[in-house]
Amino acid sequence: MNRWGLIGASTIAREWVIGAIRATGGEVVSMMSTSAERGAAYATENGIGKSVTSVEELVGDPDVDAVYVSTTNELHREQTLAAIRAGKHVLCEKPLAMTLEDAREMVVAAREAGVVLGTNHHLRNAAAHRAMRDAIAEGRIGRPIAARVFHAVYLPPHLQGWRLERPEAGGGVILDITVHDADTLRFVLNDDPAEAVAISHSAGMGKEGVEDGVMGGVRFQSGVIAQFHDAFTTKFAETGFEVHGTEGSLIGRNVMTQKPVGTVTLRNAEGESQLPLDPANLYETALAAFHSAIEGHGQPSATGEDGVWSLATGLAVVKAAATGQAAEIETGL
């Protein structure tokens, strides 16, 4: 059994990750919050035996084998490196870090320490996206030529705060949502992005210059072009993910979500058909793969390197939106 420590008393851990760890044979034995009061309450609420107030205490605990980092973005590097130095496996929330240099440092450190580093990109675990990837690989739409991602949602009040108010913490829709688009596109297309263009704005929710909406496009190395629309501000929009090829189209609806829902339609000269989907919990799929990787079998659903690619794409979108010019996507890996 893999024993986990949590860095951060986060909503995502409470709503999704703690349950996924337990459902896949792991145990959550400790959690860390800089607030002793909050940490104790969180631990009690979630059935966690220990609560500590420092990263050093958590990663130094011999009862902890792996660490889940879900603090604000600017803290990811130092906390992940501390865990790696202590010989712990790490599943880190996206984005891995605030800069590519820091993200690469995390990947190299994990490799040299011989521990597993994963990025918590949940969407590549969705049955819809896996079915689309398989259909493309099987040639069911011919050669992919374009993709479209609709990921404009409404950020609920309990998730607002720093995402809308703190640029220094990595707030804003690009590093929160666009990085997920980037990873899902890479996964489904089995292709790497090369260049991005974008326009961003604040429609009233973002403060301190934080963008709450962005539209843009990405050109992939194969020549596929993809467009995306991401936002925190749209209460009634539907999410979607489409890939269009020379011989057909894949149309995913309600698939850019944490829940195991949505549909995928294959449309071609023969008509329309629904792809069969297994509605498995996305986070349980991710944690099962992570536990297997710890045991020496395979790798996480999204590796540290995958996290570098999504961050590189997100930062290119930030640059393109700021300059009005196309920005190259380079990881330095």
Swiss-Prot record:
It catalyses: 1,5-anhydro-D-mannitol + NADP(+) = 1,5-anhydro-D-fructose + NADPH + H(+). The keyword Signal does not apply. Optimum pH is 6.5 at 30 degrees Celsius. InterPro entries: Gfo/Idh/MocA-like_OxRdtase_N (IPR000683), Gfo/Idh/MocA_domain (IPR050984), GFO_IDH_MocA-like_dom (IPR055170), NAD(P)-bd_dom_sf (IPR036291). Keywords: NADP, Oxidoreductase. It holds the Pfam family GFO_IDH_MocA_C3. Changing residue 176 to A: Less than 1% remaining activity. Gene3D superfamilies: Dihydrodipicolinate Reductase, domain 2, NAD(P)-binding Rossmann-like Domain. NADP(+) binds at residues 9-12, 33-34, 38, 71-76, 93-94, 120, 162-163, 283. GO terms for molecular function: 1,5-anhydro-D-fructose reductase (1,5-anhydro-D-mannitol-forming) activity; nucleotide binding. Monomer. Catalyzes the NADPH-specific reduction of 1,5-anhydro-D-fructose to 1,5-anhydro-D-mannitol. Also shows some activity against structurally related compounds such as 3-keto-1,5-anhydro-D-fructose, D-glucosone and D-xylosone. The enzyme cannot use NADH as cosubstrate. Belongs to the Gfo/Idh/MocA family. This is 1,5-anhydro-D-fructose reductase. It comes from Ensifer adhaerens (Sinorhizobium morelense).
